[in-house]
């Protein structure tokens, strides 16, 4: 049973180049190099889908393995999903985020896949500590939620552009230009966050799970998740009591919940402490309840909610 704790993070230098399969196309995929053709890409979950669509533009057709409204951490592949991985020209995924996707890539897509982990620089490790004792269940696990720091998506966009360019060299310059345009938009979003969160009465955020470590690090905040790196853990009554004590001790007035999982746990903590609840979306996927139609819209909705919840001026 996971015990909720303050998430402490250690920065680990990432020195290896982008981890991915060889540039050779899959047996089931297209041969590549044909100007004007559509590149079939499979992305494992929404932020990667968004990057591929922005970078590839009209030259790509992107399938998201995670259905709309589904939580991608525990995604289980169907036979159709496995066939899609095999037949794609390119699979873009994040190793360690969804184990079934890792297994599927290893089985049928190793030679036409790109793992974005190294480009994203997963430099935060999640180390839960409670009363001086380390919880070994998740100790030293890399935090995968890099896209909540918009600056980390820039390198991923460049990596995707490079890989698409090897498949379609005739349009490589366009992919590079699209990645640069996305990077400019991400830099603008980063500036909005830095300005919007520069002066807040409370810099401690309490979230339903520990998805916001990169955001917290980038913008000078401290995160505490009620559950660990995945939202499926069920906290015990003792766990909830520890969270309640933390909320009271740090004068937290807002408990943040997500759109893809039940808000029941956040509601329980809020009821015990007198705090209110508000959405803070980890953008692992979109649904009908998402506060925006794409990555940038949801990130800006998150910023607005943080400014209110943290009493920023």
Positions of predicted regions on the chain:
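Extracytoplasmic metal-acquisition and chelation regions
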Residues: 2-4, 20-313
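Sec-dependent bacterial lipoprotein signal peptides
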Residues: 1-18
């Amino acid at each position: 049973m996971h015990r909720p704790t303050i998430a402490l993070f250690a920065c680990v230098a990432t020195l290896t180049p982008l981890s991915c399969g060889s540039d050779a196309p899959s047996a089931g995929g297209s041969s590549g190099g044909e100007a004007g053709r559509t590149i079939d890409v499979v992305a494992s979950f929404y932020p990667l889908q968004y990057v591929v669509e922005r970078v590839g533009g009209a030259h790509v057709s992107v399938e998201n393995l995670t259905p709309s409204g589904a939580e991608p951490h525990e995604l289980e592949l169907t036979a159709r999903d496995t066939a899609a991985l095999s037949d794609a020209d390119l699979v873009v995924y994040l190793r360690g985020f969804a184990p079934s996707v890792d297994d599927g890539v290893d089985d049928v897509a190793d030679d036409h896949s790109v793992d974005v982990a190294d480009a994203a620089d997963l430099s935060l490790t999640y180390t839960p500590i409670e009363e001086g004792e380390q919880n070994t269940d998740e100790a030293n696990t890399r935090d995968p939620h890099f896209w909540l720091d918009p600056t980390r998506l820039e390198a991923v966009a460049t990596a995707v552009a490079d890989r698409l360019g090897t498949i379609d060299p005739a349009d490589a310059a366009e992919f590079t230009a699209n990645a640069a345009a996305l990077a400019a938009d991400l830099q603008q979003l980063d500036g909005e966050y830095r300005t919007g969160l520069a002066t807040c009465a409370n810099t401690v955020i309490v979230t339903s799970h520990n998805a916001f470590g990169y955001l917290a690090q980038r913008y000078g905040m401290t995160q505490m998740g009620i559950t660990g790196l995945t939202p499926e853990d069920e906290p015990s009554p003792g766990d909830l009591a520890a969270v309640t004590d933390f909320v009271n001790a740090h004068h937290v007035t807002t408990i943040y919940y997500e759109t893809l999982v039940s808000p029941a746990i956040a509601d329980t903590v809020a009821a015990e402490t007198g705090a209110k609840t508000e959405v803070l979306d980890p953008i692992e996927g979109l649904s009908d309840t998402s506060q925006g139609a794409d990555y940038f819209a949801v990130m800006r909705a998150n910023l607005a909610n943080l400014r209110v919840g943290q009493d920023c001026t």
